[in-house]
Structures are given as structure tokens and as C-alpha cells.
Design a protein with these regions (language model features):
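N-terminal catalytic or cofactor-binding beta/alpha core of small enzyme domains
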Residues: 1-224, 241-242, 255, 264, ...
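Active-site-adjacent mobile loop/cap segments within catalytic or ligand-binding domains
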Residues: 226-279
């Protein structure tokens, strides 16, 4: 994964690459998913902090931090609300393969830049507040996806009903079956039942509130819902956990209102959330460098 606020060889700051995703519709009552409408409306680069935005900062909010350019890499299509789709897509997003968003650069090395931070966006119910999720869950996905399918994976304890495999005298048959068993082993076997973002969620919330209109209801949530929102979040957290990488990812739940006004509000809040995430990580890196 790229380094936050690292420098190029010429001394200039490298841009911070932030992956953004949104979901496709999944309910008859909500034929338009505001998470995707917000995501696709975002610019390619995070705009500079405007003076009028800065005036919304309360006295309890952390001061703005000088940050390098921030490139927003929005996934080019809404993600289907389907377990298999998400299962296959998430590793490609983080590892720069397949459908990973392109930076649009001409150089080959710029086509699939490494992701420094990620923000998955999903729709909640008809509520008026916006919430960032602290944790994702490994199990409990009992609802059908948009295609009427259940999550086909089984928890680890169900996969290990019998560890003793038959073995022929020459050992070849047993070796083959052992190999097949390992291939079929649950992808999340051995992982914690909950994984938390490595971002300082409280600090991100303070900064997000500081950059946003004071009347907006912005919160931290402890339960992403154990549906596709939770599933994609845990998928990212688990992929990074297994790779030994910093879990620099958050999930944002937005209201279900997909009106033009609501999408415009959501767009601005997402931009300020990304700013808050980047500021928090840049400040953390600075503290680490000076040994605070």
C-alpha cells in the first residue's frame, strides 16, 4: 500500500490515493441507491479547503492539517448487492488487478495506483443521520442478496468437521485430498469475528464534524448491519489483515433519500469525510516520525 504523504524523487509530495465505492440498487422501494449517486458525482481530486468551510469548525475540533494532493479513485460502476460479486471484487480493488479503478494517467505505472485509503459507501434506511462504521463482522450474514442467494461460505468450525483424511499406503491419495481440503477451506478461517479499522475513528469524526455544517448529524456506528454493507467492509478489513497491511478503510452509511438535494449534501459530506481521514492519517504519520 502507498505511503501517506511520502515524497517523489524530485521532492514533491506524492498524491494520496483514496478508493471510493458505492452500491447498486437492491430494494424495490429504493430503485436508486444514493451511495452510488454520491460516489459517481465526486471529482477526481479533493478540492482545497474553502474559507467558508473552515468557518464551520467548532472550537473543540482539531485544526486543519496541511495535506498533499488527494486523488479520488471512484470505482467505475455501482457494486452489485451480491455476495459472490463482492467476494471476488475486493481483493482486486486492493491489489490493483481486474476492475481496479484507473488514475487515467498515461504512464503504465500510473494506471492502477496503490490505494492508501478506502471509503465504501452504502445506503441505510430512511433516517437523517450519517454514520461511519468502526467494525466489520465475520459471521451472521443470513439475508439473501439481490439475486436471492445466501452467502455460500461456511464458518470455520463447520469446515473442520473431520481433519483426519484417508491416506493410501503410498500417501498420494491422502496428499491429493489434503490439497483439495485446503483449497476449499473457508476464506476467513482463523480471523477474528470482528475487525476494526486502523484509522482513529474518533479523531476522524471530530475532524469530519469540524469541516461540515454544524447542523449535520454525523456519528460513529458499531454495527454495520450484517448485510452487503457489513460484508464489503469486513472483506476489505480481512484482506488487509491477512496481508499484514494497515487497515486504512472506513464504511459510510448514508440516508436512503436519493433526491438531487440529498445527493448534493451527501457529496459534500463525503468530500469532507475523505479530508478528515487524510488529515488524521497525515497527523498520525507526523507524530510517529517525531516520536510523540
Amino acid at each position: 500500500m502507498g505511503s501517506i504523504a511520502a515524497s517523489d524523487r524530485d521532492g514533491s509530495e506524492k498524491p494520496i490515493n483514496v478508493l471510493i465505492t458505492g452500491f447498486a440498487p437492491f430494494k424495490r422501494d429504493y430503485p436508486v441507491n444514493p451511495s452510488w449517486e454520491i460516489a459517481r458525482s465526486l471529482p477526481d481530486w479533493l478540492p482545497p479547503l474553502r474559507a467558508k468551510t473552515a468557518t464551520t469548525t467548532s472550537t473543540s475540533s482539531p485544526p486543519p492539517v496541511e495535506i498533499p494532493p488527494v486523488r479520488l479513485l471512484t470505482h467505475p460502476a455501482p457494486i452489485r448487492v451480491n455476495y459472490k460479486t463482492v467476494r471476488a471484487l475486493v481483493p482486486r480493488l486492493w491489489d490493483g488487478d481486474g476492475d481496479a479503478p484507473s488514475s487515467g494517467g498515461e504512464k503504465e505505472e500510473d494506471k492502477r495506483p496503490q490505494i492508501d485509503l478506502a471509503l465504501h459507501i452504502g445506503m441505510a434506511g430512511p433516517r437523517l443521520f450519517y454514520s461511519i462504521e468502526r467494525r466489520g463482522h465475520r459471521e451472521g450474514y443470513k439475508m439473501q442478496d439481490v439475486d436471492g442467494e445466501y452467502l455460500s461460505d461456511r464458518p470455520e468450525e463447520e469446515e473442520e468437521e473431520d481433519d483426519d483424511l484417508p491416506e493410501e499406503e503410498d500417501g498420494e491419495r491422502g496428499g491429493e485430498e489434503e490439497g483439495e481440503r485446503r483449497k476449499k477451506r473457508w476464506i476467513w478461517a482463523g480471523l477474528p469475528k470482528e475487525l476494526l479499522s486502523d484509522l482513529d475513528v474518533e479523531d476522524v469524526l471530530r475532524r469530519w464534524r469540524g469541516h461540515s455544517p454544524k447542523h449535520m448529524d454525523l456519528r460513529i456506528s458499531e454495527d454495520a448491519g450484517r448485510y452487503l454493507c457489513d460484508f464489503i467492509y469486513f472483506s476489505s478489513l480481512a484482506h488487509l489483515y491477512k496481508a499484514g497491511r494497515r487497515r486504512s478503510v472506513l464504511f459510510l452509511h448514508v440516508p436512503s433519500d436519493a433526491s438531487e438535494h440529498s445527493v448534493a449534501v451527501g457529496r459534500e459530506l463525503v468530500l469532507q469525510l475523505v479530508r478528515a481521514m487524510v488529515e488524521s492519517e497525515v497527523e498520525r504519520r507526523r507524530r510517529d516520525e517525531v516520536g510523540e
